[in-house]
């Protein structure tokens, strides 16, 4: 196992240890024991930067189930390293922040267990080279985020938000799994890098479009794109450290990572470029518009996050255009990838800080309602300074890092209008228009965020707590992130060669990418668009109280949340009605449906697929075998027409004994002995049970009832006979008997083949069967114990009376 594997597994190992450690260190905040884990990992991943800068990548292999292609292979390139640094870097700051945010009276053992579980899962997602392993980690992020969002499980809103996020993201994950399976069919591998090298084979596959759609659904649900964004605002019920970690820098970026990673496979499709770009832009516009009408600070940040994710998604779509060109034209559109990577980093810095500042305000005032807040400028001056810097960066105002990536975004959108590809030379004008409108509303909600909190009149009577500045532990992390906002804005070259260019190379599959960012690069269309955004944004701020009422008047019945809630209420009822229509509570009726479907499937398969039934090698029926079968049939007939339950049991036992005789004829004495013992015990148990049951008379059955039973019985019998003959006559592989004959002694050191198969070759199966019998025995013992206890209690009551 390599050091890279240990780095991925380290948070998962600590997640198992932390709950036990919590029992012994309750006097010290548990976060101090967790903090070294992400810090050590962050330092380790920083040490890999020089490797990716030089153009080298690392592949570490660990065989797990190689016979089915599931190996725990990890791959580090510029893209994976970027996300690993975000996961561990922001994770370190979040853990530090949580020490001040969460009191020692909280269930810290559970919280940090879930947080480390999520951290390890995210590292597994961004570093896995095997798609199946990636999927397992992908679902683990959904599961751990569910636990984190519902951490305050006494709140109904937390449970609702957690369930909503789990349902939507898991459905998206299942969609992605379908795409993974179809991809493996086209490439005969689960390795991501191998699939990228076989991109041409995938593009020629008949499943190409379907696979592309399935992967996009998985990515859109995870990164909260339209129409799947509705889970993210409700997930804000999580503790603020969770929101700062999951919903700014990590989980919501997993979908972006997936799109970036598989772009080399699907970018050649025009549908990929159009869909990724338009979905991203529509998400940017719709979420930024909705952010302006929110009253909850975390609600504003939630829709802000959705809009920023849409912005990055659209940039990845524009970057995919580079796959359709060569040379200088290709480099022109690679700028979309560069802008996406840079804004990915910028968003993690300013949004992570904003979530932490919001948590501090909530902690200090007891509310996040903008109607109750205001006038906190003099009371929380440090928080005010941090908020101004980070929100201006989010709004795209210089000299902060958000301005640089916003300019690159607008430049990419304007450049794409000159394309003579996919009708972009005509319809492409829509892209910068949507981008500019979305950016205008981004500017509006960003400035309004500052005004809501720190300006206006101070309303102490409306606040649950007396307002005060956040503690130093809750300020250190946002101060660090805000400092990075300034540093990356003034000195973006710190990131270009070390992080941005290697990550862009991994997405674009090209070399010699040069990332350049300038605070001012002349009077360009992008610069003029920015000036227009500021002017229109200021005008909308002045008239905010007038037009925001129109947005708030939007009826709830027309929202996606209403459709989700309505579906959640009605689908269980529909499912119950459908289930009750065929699950009637009567075993006979249930068996009729199950066996009827199996019979139908058998005969449809036999008719539609050509099979050959060969009677040449079938052995001749001997007299004593025929006599035994005849006896078996007669006994079965007696069971059907028997009037007495005792006689039915005897005939049923006769059938079992006849089968054991057949086993003897077929030279299987072990099976015959087992069948004989089972039949004897079953008969005894039947008789014992019937002795204690009331004497019920046989009732007259309807003709349709008897006819159905006869049809099902005959159909099952014919199905088994036909399948047996088909299986006997269509042997496409050598018999496995030879393998057991050759290896029973040398591998298992046994002479009885049947026993060796049961105990060694099928040992786990036999063990589980024994476990089932043990569980059944415990159930019977429990029922007997309870009955005896009830008898004793009733006798005591009678004695007392």
From Swiss-Prot:
InterPro entries: CPA3_Na-H_Antiporter_A (IPR050616), MrpA/MnhA1/PhaAB (IPR005663), MrpA_C/MbhD (IPR025383), MrpA_C/MbhE (IPR046806), ND/Mrp_TM (IPR001750), Proton_antipo_N (IPR001516). Keywords: Antiport, Cell membrane, Hydrogen ion transport, Ion transport, Membrane, Sodium, Sodium transport, Transmembrane, Transmembrane helix, Transport. It is found in: Cell membrane. It is a multi-pass membrane protein. The chain crosses the membrane at residues 1-21, 30-50, 79-99, 117-137, 166-186, 206-226, 228-250, 265-285, 300-320, 337-357, 373-393, 427-447, 472-492, 522-542, 591-611, 623-643, 646-666, 671-691, 707-727, 764-784. Pfam families: MbhD (PF13244), MbhE (PF20501), Proton_antipo_M (PF00361), Proton_antipo_N (PF00662). The keyword Lyase does not apply. May form a heterooligomeric complex that consists of seven subunits: mnhA1, mnhB1, mnhC1, mnhD1, mnhE1, mnhF1 and mnhG1. Belongs to the CPA3 antiporters (TC 2.A.63) subunit A family. Mnh complex is a Na(+)/H(+) antiporter involved in Na(+) excretion. This is Na(+)/H(+) antiporter subunit A1. It comes from Staphylococcus epidermidis (strain ATCC 35984 / DSM 28319 / BCRC 17069 / CCUG 31568 / BM 3577 / RP62A). The gene is mnhA1.
């Amino acid at each position: 196992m390599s050091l890279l594997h240990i780095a991925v597994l380290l948070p998962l190992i600590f997640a198992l240890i932390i709950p036990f450690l919590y029992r012994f260190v309750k006097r010290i905040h548990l976060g101090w024991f967790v903090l070294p884990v992400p810090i050590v990992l962050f330092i380790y991943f920083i040490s890999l930067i020089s490797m990716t800068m030089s153009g080298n990548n690392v592949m570490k292999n660990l065989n797990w189930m190689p016979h089915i292609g599931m190996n725990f292979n990890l791959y580090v390139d510029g893209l994976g390293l970027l996300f690993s640094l975000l996961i561990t870097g922001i994770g370190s700051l979040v853990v530090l922040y949580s020490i001040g945010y969460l009191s020692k009276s909280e269930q810290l053992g559970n919280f940090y267990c879930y947080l480390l579980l999520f951290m390890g899962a995210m590292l597994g997602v961004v570093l896995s080279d095997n798609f199946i392993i990636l999927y397992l980690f992908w679902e683990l992020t959904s599961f751990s985020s569910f636990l984190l969002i519902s951490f305050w499980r006494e709140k109904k809103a937390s449970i609702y938000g957690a369930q909503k996020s789990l349902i939507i993201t898991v459905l998206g994950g299942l969609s992605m799994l379908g795409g993974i399976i179809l991809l493996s069919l086209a490439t005969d591998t689960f390795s991501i890098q191998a699939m990228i090298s076989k991109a041409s084979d995938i593009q020629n596959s008949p499943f190409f479009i379907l696979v592309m759609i399935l992967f996009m659904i998985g990515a859109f649900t995870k990164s909260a794109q339209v129409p799947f964004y509705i889970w993210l605002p409700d997930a804000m019920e999580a503790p603020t450290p969770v929101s700062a970690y999951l919903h700014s820098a990590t989980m919501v970026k997993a979908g972006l990572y997936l799109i970036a990673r598989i772009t080399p496979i699907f970018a050649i499709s025009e549908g990929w470029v159009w869909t990724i770009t338009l979905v991203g832009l529509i998400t940017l516009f719709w979420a930024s518009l909705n952010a302006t009408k929110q009253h909850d600070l975390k609600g504003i940040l939630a829709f802000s996050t959705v809009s920023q994710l849409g912005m990055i998604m659209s940039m990845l779509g524009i970057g995919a255009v580079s796959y359709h060109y060569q040379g200088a034209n290709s480099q022109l559109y690679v700028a979309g990838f560069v802008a996406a990577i840079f804004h990915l980093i910028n968003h993690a810095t300013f949004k992570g800080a904003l979530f932490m500042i919001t948590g501090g305000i909530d902690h200090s005032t007891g509310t996040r309602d903008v109607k109750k807040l205001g006038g906190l400028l003099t009371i929380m001056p440090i928080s005010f300074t941090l908020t101004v810097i980070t929100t201006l960066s989010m709004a795209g105002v210089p000299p902060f890092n958000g301005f640089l990536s916003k300019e690159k975004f607008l430049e990419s959108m304007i450049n794409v209008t000159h394309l003579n590809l996919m009708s972009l030379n005509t319809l492409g004008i829509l892209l910068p228009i949507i981008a500019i409108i979305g950016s205008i509303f981004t500017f509006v909600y960003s400035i309004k965020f500052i005004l809501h909190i720190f300006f206006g009149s101070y309303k102490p009577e409306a606040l649950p707590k007396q307002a005060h500045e956040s503690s130093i532990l809750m300020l250190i992390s946002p101060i660090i992130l805000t400092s990075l906002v300034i540093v990356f804005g003034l000195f973006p070259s710190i990131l270009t060669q070390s992080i941005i260019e290697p990550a862009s190379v991994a997405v674009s599959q090209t070399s010699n990418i040069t990332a350049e960012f300038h605070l001012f690069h002349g009077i360009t269309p992008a610069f003029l668009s920015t000036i227009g955004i500021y002017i229109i944004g200021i005008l909308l701020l002045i008239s905010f109280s007038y037009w925001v009422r129109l947005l708030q008047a939007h009826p709830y019945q027309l929202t996606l949340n209403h459709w989700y809630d309505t579906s959640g209420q009605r689908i269980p009822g529909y499912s119950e009605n459908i289930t009750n229509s065929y699950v009637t509570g009567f075993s006979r009726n249930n068996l009729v449906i199950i066996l009827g479907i199996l019979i139908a499937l058998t005969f449809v398969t036999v008719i539609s697929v050509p099979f050959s039934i060969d009677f040449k090698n079938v052995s001749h029926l001997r007299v004593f075998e025929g006599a035994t079968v005849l006896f078996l049939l007669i006994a079965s007939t007696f069971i059907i027409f028997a009037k007495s339950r005792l006689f039915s049991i005897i005939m049923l036992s006769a059938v079992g004994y006849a089968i054991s005789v057949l086993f003897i004829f077929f030279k299987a004495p072990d099976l015959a002995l087992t069948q004989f013992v089972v039949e004897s015990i079953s008969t005894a148990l039947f008789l014992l049970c019937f002795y204690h049951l009331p004497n019920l008379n046989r009732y007259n059955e309807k003709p349709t009832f008897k006819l159905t039973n006869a049809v099902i019985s005959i159909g099952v019998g014919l199905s088994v006979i036909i399948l047996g003959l088909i299986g006997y006559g269509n042997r496409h592989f050598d018999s496995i008997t030879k393998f057991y004959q050759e290896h029973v002694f040398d591998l298992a050191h046994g002479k009885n083949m049947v026993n060796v198969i049961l105990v060694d070759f099928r040992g786990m199966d036999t063990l589980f069967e024994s476990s089932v019998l043990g569980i059944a025995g415990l159930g019977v013992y429990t029922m007997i114990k309870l009955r005896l206890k009830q008898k004793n209690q009733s006798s005591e009551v009678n004695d007392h009376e």
